[in-house]
Amino acid sequence: MNDLLLAEIKSEQNEQLQTFLLIEEFIFGTKATVQCELDELVGYCQAETDEVAEPIERAEVLINALFVDQLFIDEPQQNWSVISHQLSSALAHKLVSPILKAVLIAHIANACDCQTDIVFVPEKAMLRIICDDNYAIIFDPVTGESLNWHELDVRMNEVSGDPFEITLDIMKQESLVLEHITSLKAAFIREQAYDNALKCVDMLLALNPNDPFERRDRGFLLHQLDCFKVAYDDYQYFVEQCPKDPAAQLLKLQLDKISITDTILH
């Protein structure tokens, strides 16, 4: 990954959706061509909300415009496909992975004068539209369902610390990117697109150098691409860094049986 893209990801000054489109261009090797669709979405939502002066009502109209009119409503999924991580195909199929969808909705909402950010609510990223000093709507980017105060309180009870001092943290762009690329990597692996999965791992390692689990995954991908001698070093690093991990213990037994000098696995 080039230094310019890495700097874009780490910066908190850049428009998040544009950063995600740059990542998409790097991984898929094609320039994103979704500006017309984005402009249409923003234009539609602005037309629906422009005449609504009251902030809470404007937020509700916006959510309805996106999840009902534009068919953004979806069901939670354990695994998201590759196409759901690429904005053009995701919009075409009305199937957008959670983090990408959160970034997209935040972009549209802010363009509609709804002050919106992405916050971490255990265990997921959710959208928050701030209506005034005392009221905000927090909702799931996948289903569009909002949390009431009781549901929010139950979720926040999972966070350690003084309950009177716990606040919702705005997710940094780098955290959103890490979660998005990790999900995309898993989708590529499920679909056996190992070359593209390797691009994801390289990006993750650029952001978190020598993460043992990413080194393990890179070893697996290199192994699948018949580069076992290179993969061996990553496997060995994972075993050394995480000796108590059950996967590392099993992998060590396998590595001990291999003579790296004369064995190439296919």
Q: Model segments located where?
A:
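A structural boundary/capping signal
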Residues: 1-266
